[in-house]
Amino acid sequence: MYAKLSRLIATIMLLVSVSAQATPVIQQWQAPSGAQVYFVENHDLPMLDAAVAFPAGSGFDTADKSGLAGLTLGLLSQGAEGMNEDDISRRLADVGAQMGGNFDADRAGVSIRTLSSKAEREEALTVMARMLQRPLFPEAVLAREKTRLIAALKEAETRPESIAGKAFSKAVFGSHPYGFQGSGEIDTVEKLQRSDLDNFYTAHYGAKTAVVALMGDISRAEAEEIAQRLTGELPPGGASDQIAAVSKLSSASTLRIAHPATQSHILLGAPGVSRADADYFSLYVGNYILGGGGFVSRLMQEVREKRGLAYSVYSYFIPMQQPGAFQIGLQTRKDQADEAFKLVHKTLQDFVEKGVSEKELTAAKQNILNGFPLRIDSNKKILEYLAVIGFYHLPLTYLDDFQTKISKVTVADVNAAFKRKINPDVLATVIVGSPEEKAQLAKTAGDSK
């Protein structure tokens, strides 16, 4: 009886902490251009944060043009109608505006932070609108950026963490675009032409698939004008905004790659969860217990605290439009790589088979909810949430839902979700810096799927 009462009290306290945390009010509408707009009005600071994102990430590359999506985004700020790259930098600097970007397998976008005062805001938005809607993709700049990118790709081929990441993506996703490197391959980047960038931009940077996020010191009427201004002259688009379905792994695989580094870099995982998956919140809490909670996680306790096999070990899910990777990673001395790998695998196997305890669950939920205010404590962080909510068609109540749904996750929810999504016997494993006598060149899981 006392155990049930304790659980009830813990649940009530979680719900109280949830209800006490205020979340921003999100306004949403469709601009005349067809773009979806998400806006939070906040006059605490004389600032405006604006972002425009498109379904134009590396997941929309093709194998023969890997790297195209990233180069297209990168060159938006390198020249637009009436402005070269120096003009863009100077005009933004003159009004104290900061330009940024967002790029992953699903999304590509541009963001800006500016003072909300009329003169500064107008100049910053003029530059941003021109970049988005009148890019030039100058030949000379493209040649220079390709040279820089190829040099970076060659350098990455020497670093064990880069080698491991690339091999892991291929092992988990095979020929699926999620297995491509966002920066591309040396041979594909070398062949990219200006016409490729222009065609990709025209197909993927359309107004009807654009998501505009606005946060800060402006009114609703001003937000409506800004959203239309940033998207009203975008190309028609027309390319699909859907990524191809991801296949589950059909068998386990292990790839050992020799490297002179003193430590082995170990990655293991599989396709995990999409943004829209009903198991998302259960997996989120469960992963906090497994390897996402730092020193309180099981992996850290078993691998570092009890045995000293690694300084750090982690696990995470990457929720995407299609299931992104579930990944466990660590570094350890070469002579203990096999021991560390076996321990990590056994810890995961026990986690999936035996599940989590009520004590672990309560602590994890409390830590997640206590940390929630830090997730929305700046305009920039809220802006990114607006972009995610819009891009993945999440409800406007997502920030409230996040807290409520986390608080309601049960032991049974976590255990069932992990059993559905993670099979410890069917994982892709990559060990870079494996002991030389064990290193081998092998096919990736993607080649045998």
Where are the regions a protein language model picked out?
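Bacterial N-terminal signal peptides that target proteins for export
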Residues: M1-I9
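Bacterial N-terminal signal peptides
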Residues: L8-S19
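Boundary at the C-terminal end of the N-terminal hydrophobic targeting segment
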Residues: A20-P24
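Short acidic-hydrophobic surface loop/beta-edge motif
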Residues: Q27-P32, L255-H259
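M16 family metallopeptidases and their MPP-like homologs
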Residues: V40, L45-L71, E85-M131, K146, ...
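A common structural junction motif
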Residues: A129-F137, L230-G238, K346-G355, G446-K449
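An aromatic/glycine/proline-enriched structural segment found at the starts
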Residues: G182, D187, A207, V211-S274, ...
